[in-house]
Amino acid sequence: MRLMPAFLSGFRINHCLKHLRRPRIAGGLLGLALGFGGGACGPAELAGDTWTLREAHGSAESGNGLSTNGLSTNGLSTNGLSTHGLSINGLSTIEFSHWFNQDPARADELMRYIIRCAAKANQQRKYTNPVTGVKYTWEGGLGLAPNWATGAPATAQEEEIVSACLAAHANKFGISVAISVLGRDARDSALPYTEQELSTFSEREACFFGNLFDGTGVFAATDRGYLREDESTVRACGLPSSPAHADCLPIIHAGTCESLCQRAATAALPFGWESGEPPYYETCTYNGRTFQPLTTRLQPRDIHRCGDGVCQLTERCGDGVVAGSCQADCGTCPY
């Protein structure tokens, strides 16, 4: 199977978005009409390739659900962005220009991920900043919000699934990591995947859900239990060492997927899953509200262990055997 470039889970978390409960903006800047192939653009480039598990019945060339995350959590704010439509017309409005030019670099990064989440792999948006003249091109990827991507106002379901997608691609380190994304699009069609993908991305990670566009916020829950003391990963938003260490605002840690979510019906899967357990969740309920989530998986190599011989970004020097004090990999501290 050939992994198709699509997304990187390296969106950095925007700590300016800690307070997301704001009133919905009727037609705010998210009134971006995603006119494909035309003219609207967005977020900054991803640091690497992205993939998503979307290949169930198609060839790898048709686009999959494998992605790479690299969106900073600082970039997760959609304040001022309306959901009127991601078409060329929507991107040419004065409102969009005003929103974009408040922070072009961050807006570019966010738009890159929005288009990759909402639009299909054969679609793109181009945008020329009327203030600076800089041109942007944002490529589609997962196709989770087909109506919104073609210029229609986003439905509540599309807002939820794109929010889940943005959260799934965010990490507070801004490091690109290949992830497997499973779930359904806003039209209830499953993202294709193969047995090989599930085998390669064998580590369950998390489920993501919420709504960034109506002030609800976004949430993450672990799908494999918390990391051991000797384990660490840059994907700490979905896979923390404990609830107390899930510092990924504006993403709120909500507990475990098993306790909050309902797995997809086995009959809906494209092939039998060995364990008899569907690999993704269809709904998650939190604070009395039910959301449409996305489920993610990792490759084993992206969960680091103290003692594996490499001092990782997520490990520290010291005289211990845990990630925060890993003598075997990082040595003793010089002071």
Predicted regions and their residues:
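Post-signal peptide N-terminal segment of mature Sec-exported envelope proteins
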Residues: 49-70
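Long, low-hydrophobicity ectodomains and other hydrophilic envelope-associated domains
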Residues: 77, 82-301
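N-terminal secretory signal peptides that target proteins for export/translocation
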Residues: 1-22
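Cysteine-rich modules of extracellular adhesion/ECM and protease-associated proteins
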Residues: 303-335
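Bacterial signal peptide processing site
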Residues: 42-44
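Bacterial N-terminal signal peptides
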Residues: 27-37
